[in-house]
């Protein structure tokens, strides 16, 4: 008898195979999950202990610190935003090839840049170089601020003057040169120089002629041409009239005081209505007034030591003490003593009060010779030049005379002015004495002084034609 084996049904076999496949998939998924867990566990820092783990943690920690100090590069926009938070001025070193825009704000005076202006300049290597700001005030010198300043240059080619604004500090540079070269140049001559322009024709205003020639009876013809503006020099100096005529054209181009007077602008309403600086006259006050300049008219002062100085005194200016050396013009005191008896003497200078007032306190402490003193603040500043407008005196101009070594100083009252040679050191000078007879005669006439001064000195004939 044979035994017959029974075969399984196909459904059952398929089911076993399915169960087997499902088990395999389950095991494979479990294996994958275990592997993923192992990978994640490897990524997580292990809590190890001991010396070895401490060293590992130290090494890992230093590496992370370096990564923090050197982060990944960011975009230029992000970097610039962070830099702007640090400083208000963006760096220009990152972009040296890009030009820097220059913005300049023009002022209202001659177009000069007096307002904001970029104070840095780009070098060739792309770096910035600091430049001084144009808004800083100009440098000034002691000589230009204390003593009478030199007038700014005027010429036919420069009708508006050099300054272009009512700034009194712009003639300071020339004043310093004149004062510094004063002793070096003047000491070479044995006689006095007529004006600053004789020794320094490019720096100051020469007087057309000396008062001595007028007082000796020499009168100019109104029909002849304007003479050279070089002051007459003594024969000992070695200069001839031909040399003066040759230098006339050059002097005209450099400076012409009468061209300045011809083109000086008229006084404004505010200047015309200024309150008089002097008190009213009293019964004891003389009827006529004589206005006198100080520097190079009555005295010559210097900050350099002068061996023949008549006196010296200190001046405190801007917290610094300076020593001033003074020479007195010959017959200075005799002239004042005589004129103070018949005139109301008024000192009118373009110098600073801190210097001039102290000098007068030494020369005339009781104000017996000079009744009143006026200083730079009483002058009218026109295009950087100080002009002595006699209207501020509050006196009758028909009985007022001014003596000054610079005719520009009395440009608004030319008929009231008597020019005099500038004095520096000549011990034989007699210009003050020569004026005494004429001044005494004006008082005796008791008339309007202006026609007599005009006929005697003829300054109007020196003005250029229209």
Swiss-Prot record:
Q: Which CDD domains match?
A: HAD_FCP1-like
Gene3D superfamilies, alphabetized: HAD superfamily/HAD-like
Q: Which Pfam families match?
A: NIF
GO MF terms on file?
phosphoprotein phosphatase activity
Where in the numbering of this chain does the FCP1 homology domain appear?
A: 283-442
Q: What is its EC number?
A: 3.1.3.-
Its function, per the record, reads: Probable phosphatase.
Q: What is this protein called?
A: CTD small phosphatase-like protein 2
- Which species is this UniProt entry from? Xenopus tropicalis
């Amino acid at each position: 008898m044979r035994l017959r084996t029974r075969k399984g049904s196909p459904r059952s076999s398929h089911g076993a195979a399915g169960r087997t496949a499902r088990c395999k998939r389950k095991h494979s998924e479990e294996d994958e999950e275990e592997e993923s867990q192992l990978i994640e566990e490897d990524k997580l820092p292990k809590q190890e202990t001991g010396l070895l783990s401490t060293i590992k943690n130290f090494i890992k920690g230093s590496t992370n610190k370096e990564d923090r100090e050197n982060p990944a590069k960011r975009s230029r926009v992000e970097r610039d935003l962070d830099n702007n938070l640090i400083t208000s001025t963006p760096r220009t070193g990152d972009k040296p090839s890009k030009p820097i825009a220059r913005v300049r704000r023009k002022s209202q005076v001659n177009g000069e840049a007096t307002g904001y202006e970029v104070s840095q300049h780009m070098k060739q290597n792309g770096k910035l170089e600091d430049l001084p700001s144009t808004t800083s005030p100009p440098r000034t010198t002691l000589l230009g601020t204390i003593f009478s300043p030199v007038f700014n240059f005027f010429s036919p080619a420069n009708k508006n003057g050099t300054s272009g604004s009512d700034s009194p500090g712009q003639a300071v540079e020339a004043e310093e040169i004149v004062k510094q070269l004063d002793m070096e140049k003047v000491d070479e001559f044995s006689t006095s120089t007529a004006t600053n322009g004789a020794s320094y024709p490019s720096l100051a205003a020469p007087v057309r002629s000396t008062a001595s020639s007028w007082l000796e009876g020499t009168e100019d013809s109104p029909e002849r041409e304007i003479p050279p503006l070089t002051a007459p020099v003594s024969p000992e100096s070695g200069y001839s009239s031909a040399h003066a005529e040759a230098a006339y054209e050059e002097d005209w181009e450099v400076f012409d005081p009468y061209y300045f007077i011809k083109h000086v602008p008229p006084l404004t309403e505010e200047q015309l209505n200024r309150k008089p600086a002097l008190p009213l006259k009293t019964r004891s006050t003389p009827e006529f007034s004589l206005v006198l300049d100080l520097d190079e008219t009555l005295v010559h002062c210097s900050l350099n030591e002068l061996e023949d100085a008549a006196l010296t005194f200190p001046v405190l200016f801007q917290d610094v003490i300076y020593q001033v050396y003074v020479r007195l013009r010959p017959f200075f005191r005799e002239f004042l003593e005589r004129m103070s008896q018949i005139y109301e003497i008024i000192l009118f200078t373009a110098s600073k009060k801190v210097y001039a007032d102290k000098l007068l306190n030494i020369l005339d402490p009781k104000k017996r010779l000079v009744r009143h003193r006026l200083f730079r603040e009483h002058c009218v500043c026109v295009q950087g030049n100080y002009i002595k407008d006699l209207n501020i005196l509050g006196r009758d101009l028909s009985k007022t005379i001014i003596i000054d070594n610079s005719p520009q100083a009395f440009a608004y009252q030319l008929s009231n002015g008597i020019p005099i040679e500038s004095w520096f050191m000549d011990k034989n000078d007699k210009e003050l004495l020569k004026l005494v007879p004429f001044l005494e005669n004006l008082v005796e006439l008791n008339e309007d002084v202006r026609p007599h001064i005009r006929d005697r000195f003829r300054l109007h004939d020196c003005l250029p034609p229209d």
